[in-house]
């Protein structure tokens, strides 16, 4: 059985207003040692991404690496000069997707982490760092604590009109509550 490794990367999120539930960031950044002693090399994902494309599929989007908690789908995965840039869409029709979205908007969760199998890796004898030359990417998770501190969600899109409406309703409810005393009756 193949062994899967989990590693996380991070980058701060900024809310956006176009499509609710859509977010982007770096699932992995090249040349950055994570807290497990791994550094992903440029090009490490190329073969895996091509294999996913040839099958017409994408890696899973999970919540905290829990295979029983898929929360959305990856709409864009590409290597650039920085790392593995991803864009995804949370499923806002399911509880877990809504909860993940609220965490992203609040900034309480903004880490990204990859689940992968190392196909080719080289260990630096002096530093002990393992350089990942090629990996099979299995999944990318939203996580609280990424192994790679530079693997973060960069943007979160939300419906400002929707959140503005809820804010106005909340403000109105507070004004009503402040203006009217609450009475409790007993029989």
PLM features per residue range, with description:
Residues 2-4:
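Terminal, non-catalytic protein-protein interaction segments that mediate quaternary/complex assembly
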Residues 6-24, 59, 75-176, 181, ...:
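Residue microenvironments linked to proteolytic maturation
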Residues 20-46:
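N-terminal "first-domain core" detector
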Residues 27-29, 63-65, 88:
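Pocket-edge structural micro-motifs
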Residues 32-34, 68-70, 121-123:
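Flexible loop/turn segments at secondary-structure boundaries
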Residues 39-66:
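Small/polar-rich, solvent-exposed N-terminal microdomains that initiate assembly or binding
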Residues 39-42, 74-78:
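Glycine-rich loop at the start of a catalytic domain that most often binds anionic cofactors/ligands
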Residues 63-72, 77:
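A surface-exposed loop-and-adjacent beta-strand signature within N-terminal beta-sandwich domains
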């Amino acid at each position: 059985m193949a062994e899967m490794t989990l590693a996380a990367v991070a980058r701060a999120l900024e809310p956006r207003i176009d499509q609710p539930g859509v977010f982007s960031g770096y699932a992995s950044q090249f040349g950055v040692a994570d807290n497990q002693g791994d550094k992903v090399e440029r090009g490490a994902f190329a073969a895996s991404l091509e294999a996913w494309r040839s099958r017409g599929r994408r890696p899973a989007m999970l919540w905290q690496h829990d295979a029983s908690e898929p929360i959305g789908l990856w709409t864009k995965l590409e290597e650039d000069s920085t790392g593995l840039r991803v864009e995804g869409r949370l499923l806002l029709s399911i509880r877990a997707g809504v909860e993940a979205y609220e965490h992203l908007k609040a900034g309480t969760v903004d880490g990204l982490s990859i689940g992968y199998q190392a196909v080719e890796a080289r260990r630096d004898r002096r530093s002990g760092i393992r350089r990942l030359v090629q990996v099979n990417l299995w999944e990318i998770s939203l996580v609280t604590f990424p192994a790679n501190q530079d693997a973060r969600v960069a943007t979160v899109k939300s419906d400002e009109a929707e959140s503005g409406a809820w804010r106005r309703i909340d403000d109105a409810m507070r004004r009503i509550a402040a203006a009217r005393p609450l009475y409790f009756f007993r029989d």
